[in-house]
């Protein structure tokens, strides 16, 4: 069964394994916002660059009470390498399964030769508000489409400062 997430809908309550040995839910009734970045995996150089650029803005996100969270289908060892090589301090989830990918409405790809030996999600970005609702959704079917980081940061700030409503709900 295919799923489509909708603006303003509740984020699917998926439990994610983290590289630090803990688990996390995409919504846990905290007062924090969550910026969830779905990346293709360690094999993707564009993902590496994008993650690094977001991580360089981690303090800005923290100032906006927004937790940065990366997830992929990579196994633990590859997710750890991704985090270590990029010096990521954010939460890093791994082992995203096909059911979780579908619940998030992600595009899923078969690997090409010399990539990986498992299916993986294409990139996505979700801004989850403190009520667990999807405030911003960007889902891509290819690695070449990524929202501009500075625009996302300005958007989060504008949403929070102006109580800007969730758009695209009709």
Task: Say what each PLM segment does.
Residues 1-170:
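Chalcogenol-based redox active-site neighborhoods
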């Amino acid at each position: 069964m295919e799923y489509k997430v909708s603006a303003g809908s509740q984020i699917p309550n998926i439990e994610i394994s983290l590289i630090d040995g803990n688990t996390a839910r995409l919504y846990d009734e905290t007062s924090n916002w969550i910026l969830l970045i779905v990346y293709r995996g360690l094999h993707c150089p564009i993902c590496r660059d994008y993650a690094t650029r977001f991580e360089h803005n981690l303090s800005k996100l923290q100032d906006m009470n927004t937790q940065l969270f990366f997830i992929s289908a990579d196994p633990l060892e590859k997710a750890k390498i991704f985090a270590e090589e990029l010096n990521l301090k954010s939460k890093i989830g791994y082992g995203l399964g096909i059911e979780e990918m579908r619940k998030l409405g992600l595009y899923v790809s078969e690997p090409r030769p010399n990539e990986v030996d498992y299916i993986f999600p294409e990139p996505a970005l979700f801004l989850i508000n403190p009520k667990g609702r999807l405030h911003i959704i960007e889902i891509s079917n290819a690695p070449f489409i990524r929202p501009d980081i500075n625009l996302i940061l300005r958007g989060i700030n504008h949403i929070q400062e102006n109580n800007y409503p969730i758009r695209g709900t009709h």
